[in-house]
Structures are given as C-alpha cells and as structure tokens.
Regions:
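Long intrinsically disordered, low-complexity regulatory segments
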Residues: 1, 21-25
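Bacterial N-terminal signal peptides that target proteins for export
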Residues: 2-13
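Bacterial N-terminal signal peptides
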Residues: 11-22
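N-terminal targeting leaders of membrane proteins
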Residues: 24-104, 108-119, 209-255
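Short low-complexity stretches enriched in small and charged residues
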Residues: 62, 128-132, 195-199
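Mid-length scaffold segments of soluble, non-membrane domains
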Residues: 101-180
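Surface-exposed interaction patches
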Residues: 145-148, 161, 166-254
Length: 255
C-alpha cells in the first residue's frame, strides 16, 4: 500500500513537469468540432522516468484510443454535459443527493460479490451491513444511514477481483463514452453489468425500466465527476489520463 502511494506521488511530481512543459508548448487547439493535438508525444521531451508511459503501460491501440478520446470529448461537450447541466438545474440538491445515494447502494451488490471473490470477510460483512441498513432504514438507499452509523463503504469491482488473482492490466483502452480503461477492467465492467442485469431480470424489470436506470446512472455518475476534457492546458493530457488511471487502478487492487 505504501509503495503504491509512493509511486503515485512520484508520478504526480512527474506530471507537474509535464504540465509545466505543456504551458511552454503548444496545447491542443480546438477549431470548431476539431481538436488539433501536437504531433509530438510526452516521452520525447521528458526524462527516462516518464518512459513508464510507453514502456510499462501497454498501448498498442494508441491511434484508436486517441480517436475515441476525441470522440468522447465531443460527446461530453455536446450531449452528456448539456443533459447533466439540465438535470442539475431542475433537480433539488436533496433529491440529487438521494439519487446518488441510491445508485451507490446498488453498487454495494457488486462490491459484496467481489469482496467474497477476493476472500475479504471484513469487506463482505461491512458491505452487507451497509446494504441492509440503507435498503431498509435508508429507503432503498436514498438516505445513507450506514455512513451515519460509521459503517465503512468499499468499492470493489470484477476488474479488481481479476487483478487480485494476478491478472494483468492488458492493453490500455479508451471505451466509448465511459473513458479510460484497459482490457482487464473492460471485461470486469461487462461481468459486473451482467451480474446486475441478472438481478434486474429476477425482479421482473421491464426493458424500459432497465434502460431508464442505466441512463439515470450515467447522468448521476457524470454529474459527480469534475473532470472536463482538454481543460488541463497540457498537450499531454491523453498520456496524463492514461498514467493516472493505471496508477489509481493499481492502488485500488492493492488496498
């Protein structure tokens, strides 16, 4: 755990250098819908330490990933964020928080399953307690009673479970709309989605209800993420995101 934090600190310090260089370089330029990125990459101007970006993070599909990154930027700007901003404008704060709590409560289902698969009795018991308390006393999770009772919240997914059992990252991958990932985490995302979908089927939910929940979950998730594409002012934003995502996931698995 301490090693992971030291690595993150080291990478963050390197990223400060990246951003400083970016301030003196040509940042991505937006021309209408187009985003023109500099033709050079971070590993040409930084020292050997930042070769981690290309040497340790496998990115054989970089061309596709960068194209998808730009697609996500446009989708975010012209579709996702306008919807999110409209949602936040018409939804009272207390209701918005309640909806967020509701989806966090649903996530405890996959956290419970993955805690078992990771042989973690403490996380399993605590997550079970949170889910039972919030689902009953907390009115299906709209009120986070468990946190008021100091029951810790954990976040575990199948990608972390695969990592726990020694499965490597695989190549870096930028998913449509969802953003940075890798092959292992992409598979994990699919397994977690399938698990929740099976539960919805057991509850006899209609397809329209499933889609409504999925869309609402997406809006809620984006509303709670502060990141905005191409606002770093750095020409190395793609590399920056790739490094931070990979380091964070390593920490998630090791915690």
């Amino acid at each position: 755990m301490k090693t992971a934090y030291k690595q993150l600190l080291r990478h963050l310090l390197l990223l400060v250098a990246v951003l400083a260089l970016g301030a003196c370089s040509t940042a991505p330029v937006q021309q209408g819908d187009a985003v023109i990125e500099p033709s050079f990459s971070a590993d040409r101007v930084l020292d050997d330490d930042l070769a981690y970006l290309s040497d340790e993070i496998s990115d054989p599909w970089e061309g596709f990933n960068r194209s998808m990154y730009r697609f996500n930027y446009r989708f975010d700007k012209y579709v996702f964020l306008p919807v999110v901003n409209g949602y936040k404008a018409i939804t009272p704060d207390f209701l918005e928080q309640g909806i967020h709590n509701f989806f966090l409560n649903i996530e405890d289902i996959t956290t419970f399953i993955n805690s078992i698969l990771q042989l973690s009795p403490t996380k399993t018991v605590q997550t079970t307690g949170r889910f039972l308390v919030n689902t009953t006393v907390g009115l299906l999770g709209f009120i986070d009673v468990a946190s008021r009772l100091d029951i810790p919240k954990h976040d575990e997914d199948f990608g972390q479970t695969l990592g726990y059992w020694g499965v490597g990252n695989g190549p870096f991958l930028v998913l449509p709309v969802l953003g940075p990932s890798n092959v292992r985490d992409g598979v994990g995302l699919g397994v977690d989605w399938y698990t929740l979908n099976e539960i919805r089927d057991e509850l006899d939910m209609k397809d329209s209800e499933k889609w409504a929940l999925t869309i609402m979950k997406g809006i809620d998730t984006r509303a709670n993420v502060a990141f905005r594409y191409y606002e770093t002012g750095s020409p190395f934003e793609y590399d920056w995101v790739k490094l931070l995502y990979t380091t964070k996931r390593k920490m998630d698995i090791e915690k």
